[in-house]
Amino acid sequence: SNNRLYPFWGDLEEGLKTGKPQNATKNGGSPLFEAIYADETKLREFLHAMGGIQTGNFMMLANVFDFSNYNTLCDIGGSGGNLSIHVAKNNPHMTCKSFDLPPVTPIANENITALGLSDRVTAISGDFFENDFPKADVITMGNILHDWGTKDKLMLITKAYNALPKGGALIVIENIIDDDRRHNAFGL
């Protein structure tokens, strides 16, 4: 991603003066996610990076959240399946689904199979804007909502609510900057 993002900093002054985005679309290039998903190597690198950034959060969730009253989980925008994998490894009674776009599903299934969890974790294809969410006792969204405006956030949260049973749980994982920037490594 450095190769793609670094050149945009050259237009920082223009961005500050105009308030307009200084990204690839400015000069007729593809939007970020479109460019990533068009190249399997870039997609694998992106999924690996996103999984690495969130591993600590996913491990903490799997160990700290009380899953004892739940049996199923669906991770919306599940990427390489990491959240579902961590929850399944730490909660043997849980079955998990990792829900993401079709190009991601085979990569997630490779990760799941490599860890011997394909009996309890599956990757399923779908588009969280176009499709209803799969039903589950717990719906998770890791680093999803921050990418979208209020209207889309409300739509995604409504879809999650509709996929949950009474007593279900929606868990949103986002990196929030600590105003003091002393107690949050991501905020530094």
Descriptions of predicted regions:
Residues F67-S68, T72-L188:
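Alpha-helical subdomain
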